């Protein structure tokens, strides 16, 4: 799996950063691409990357602020002509996302040549697709804003060859059945496959947050995550200023990393008050402290393997 950032600025774009957009490549578990938020200009950003809109099967919107959705109508329209013809799309987001898209399409007389399935979240959501489980939980941003916990499929445990030989089953095609089925038959007897396999291993867990001030659901979403994508609109100054505007300060994110046992954190949605030089200087200062957890400030077009 791989996460790619097409926009990392908060509120407004800058000369160096677009507004929010994240792509999650599901390979090797699936050939699909999932997008999280579609800020203005996202489709133009994607033109600079190998990702194709035709491979985008799902779009997850965290909340309805413009810097997270203003690029959606244009991207949906362009998908019709960039390999998305007749390929269904699932659009998940807060209440109102369906009305926003349909009104935009109607007023602009745009016609999509593929079906969209809308899933509007109320308080929380559990969604299953291609072995993936996605949980959405409500955050604290003044308007409905959600964080998504994406759990990849489990990897089947290793076959216990000696145990199979003990029942007279030698290596061969039957082993694939043991690996991929709940039960198998040998010499007229039915066996439980789990008795001949090691423990299954949970696939990668990715937590992707919408805008929020600290809240209890953050720990639910990010618990034991392999990768967490979190906003830190404010990366210096006084923490209360961030929280007054229902946003997170870098210190809030560091506390969450430690509480939730997050392995790697990618910080996005940086205020447009910070230029690249500012961000680099703040980063160097922060990592001098031995208590600072593992994190990166991300920039547009950064990609990270999971």
Swiss-Prot record:
Cofactor annotation comment: Binds 2 Zn(2+) ions.
Cofactor: Zn(2+)
GO molecular function terms listed in the Swiss-Prot or TrEMBL record: 3'-tRNA processing endoribonuclease activity; zinc ion binding
Sequence positions that bind Zn(2+) 1: 63, 65, 141, 211
Reaction(s) catalysed (UniProt annotation): Endonucleolytic cleavage of RNA, removing extra 3' nucleotides from tRNA precursor, generating 3' termini of tRNAs. A 3'-hydroxy group is left at the tRNA terminus and a 5'-phosphoryl group is left at the trailer molecule
Record has Translocase as a keyword: no
Domain of life: Bacteria
Entry keywords, A to Z: Endonuclease, Hydrolase, Metal-binding, Nuclease, tRNA processing, Zinc
Enzyme class: hydrolase
EC number: 3.1.26.11
Residues the record lists as binding Zn(2+) 2: 67-68, 211, 269
Keyword Nuclease: yes
CDD domains, A to Z: RNaseZ_ZiPD-like_MBL-fold
Entry function: Zinc phosphodiesterase, which displays some tRNA 3'-processing endonuclease activity. Probably involved in tRNA maturation, by removing a 3'-trailer from precursor tRNA.
Family to which this protein belongs: Belongs to the RNase Z family.
HAMAP family: RNase_Z_BN
Name this polypeptide is given: Ribonuclease Z
